[in-house]
Amino acid sequence: MKLILKHIAFLGLALVFLAACNTDKLDYPDAYKVADGIPVVKSIRYANTDTYITQAYMNETVCLLGDNLRSVTQLWFNDQKATLNTSYITDNTLLVSVPKNYPKKRTDKIYLITKNEADTVKYDFVVLPPLPNVASMSNEWAAVGEEVTIYGDYFIDDTSSPVVISFPGADVPHADMTFDGSSSVTFKVPAGALPGYVSVKTMSGTSRSKFMYKDSRNILFDWDGSRGGHAIGQGWRNGSKVHRTPGSDPFPAIDGNYICFQGKEVGPGASDVWDEDNLSFNYWPTPGDPLKGELSSRPEFARLIEDYGIGGLQIKFEALVNTPWTNVGLQLVFTSNADVTMAAATNAYFGNVSIARGIWEPWVSAGGSFDTAGKWITVSIPLSDFNKKPNGTASESTLKADSLTGLSFFLWYGTSSGTKCTPTIAIDNIRVVPIG
């Protein structure tokens, strides 16, 4: 009996094995098969509409209409290979996404390649880059004739559609533009340029900058009152000891008076730096005073806080770092009336780890040393990045709307320890403005 059962078991396994082997010979009528012959493209439309097109932006999905499209095994837009999904290919339709990389060499054609690369069919089609993204400018307060760089993406300078950069009142001569790939372009501020947004026009269309040239919105400190900001701070170190007028230093002013932190060698750590006289300024408010009250009570600042919230705002200022900066960070500390006022004077907030602050220390990302090569630059820090303790580690606190009544800058401590240095850091036109 056992022998019979063994034979039955063996026979069952054999049948299973034979059945498995024979599945290779089964015919699946719905399986995708590459067709022979040559594809024919009659038209192209968007994947989700009946609009017929002759061009599309990178990463858009399009639908090729024609005959024998299952013969296509490769599809290229210019010199960029597209990804084919056979689930979206029939004899008469082919859905495909335009590659997200801009071609190195434009031919304005689609190439449809058949099995074994036997044949290549060409079809006229233009790939457009997205609209230019005009993100930032090296110096928003540059003078006419001064060289600046704008940063962003998709600054595609095509011979058939050259880039046009426009300031209010003046365009940049194309011959003055120097491109570094498609992410930045350098030029001189043209004669006649007026304050306002900068626009960049490419073959894809026109985009407006996220910044403003000579941005005078909500300037909190301009150090001479010429832009509606405070001409001096308020507190034990109100800025008078670091206040400068044009001609005070061997480098040029950018917009009248400014402040400059200098004259002190700073070493690593918290205890080897503290010099409020030479390396800081305070603004401690006098609540209710129409001239010396809370910063956040200034009408323009109050409106921006209401409209954009903390997450939609950034602090900006112009800076010139004239000597190598290799150590400590610039602490940017907004304070509330509970932290400090003119009546309740104290500097304890500098070391208070529960007060979240921003820290600017560009020498860290620059490889250990930073200067601006004698030029002014624009510094931008989102208020959402005011989330650090004095040593740069993450704070348990976050910046809130009621924490914007006072402001202090102090060159002290920071996230990293570098080498001793005697930095010279000039600052002007401190402002809080929308991010975009």
Annotate each PLM feature:
Residues N22-R70, E117-S160, P195, S204-G229:
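Beta-strand/beta-sandwich contexts
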Residues V16-A20:
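C-terminal motif of bacterial Sec signal peptides marking the signal peptidase cleavage site
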Residues F211-D222, Y413-G436:
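Extracellular polysaccharide-targeting segments
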Residues L291, L295, Y308-I310, Q314-G392:
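Extracellular ligand-binding interfaces
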Residues V62-L64, L75, L94-V96, D108-I113, ...:
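A structural motif
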Residues K104-N116, A193-M203, S408-F409:
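Short, aromatic- and glycine-rich surface loops/edge beta-strands on solvent-exposed regions
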Residues L313-F317, G329-L332, T378-T424, I430:
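Extracellular beta-strand ligand-recognition surfaces/modules
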Residues H243-S296:
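Short carbohydrate-recognition loop motifs
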